[in-house]
Design a protein with these regions (language model features):
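Conserved catalytic core of the tyrosine transesterase superfamily
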Residues: 1-193
Length: 193
């Protein structure tokens, strides 16, 4: 018998508002780095392994170059405000970094997966009411929020680096409230009431 696939767990938009996120962070190196990690996960949907693999040269003014699964490279657009956050982080990072990895510890060495996982888990614990907290939850959240705000499946597939559309379709789990809202706005009889 076929087992049912679990729906992705995701945070609500208001839980990850810029104002709410800003309240958690100061201006020291660790705070700036951690906020940038959180924002990159949420605003780009990249995987933990992709974040750790990022080099400084992979960042350009409106995009980042990501090396995904099976060494597939993809370009992901970033907002101007996210690029400014990256620049502010680089100003703190460059004097201490040992190598070209974008994300480093305060001793200049590259980040490692367990460190990032634990830090994101802590941050999501302060921001959300989710039971499950991880970088991958931010990937699910990115995908869900993109679809809920009008992104198409093909676009989302490209942004997430999925090999097939079937992998992306798991994010079409709109809430009933959203389905009802779309129905009310789109069906001609509902628009007349």
């Amino acid at each position: 018998p076929k087992t049912e696939k679990r729906l992705p767990v995701f945070a609500r938009e208001k839980e990850l508002s810029p104002e709410r996120i800003s309240t958690l962070f100061g201006n020291d190196f660790n705070a700036v780095r951690d906020k940038l990690m959180l924002e990159l996960f949420y605003q780009t949907g990249i995987r933990l392994s992709e974040l750790i693999a990022l080099n400084v040269a992979d960042v350009q003014s409106h995009q980042i170059k990501v090396l995904g699964k099976r060494n597939k490279e993809r370009i992901i657009p970033i907002s101007h405000s996210l690029f400014k956050e990256i620049q502010a982080y680089l100003n703190l990072r460059n004097p201490i970094a040992k190598g070209n990895k974008l994300f480093v510890l305060s001793n200049g060495k590259p980040l490692y997966p367990v460190f990032v996982y634990r830090r994101i888990n802590e941050l999501l614990g302060s921001l959300t009411t989710l039971d499950k907290k991880s970088p991958h939850i931010l990937r699910h959240t990115f995908a869900t929020h993109m679809l809920n705000n009008g992104a198409g499946l093909e676009t989302l597939k490209a942004l997430l680096g999925h090999a097939s559309l079937a992998a992306t379709q798991v994010y079409t789990h709109n809430s009933f409230a959203q389905l009802a809202q779309i129905y009310t706005q789109a069906h001609p009889r509902m628009m007349r009431d």
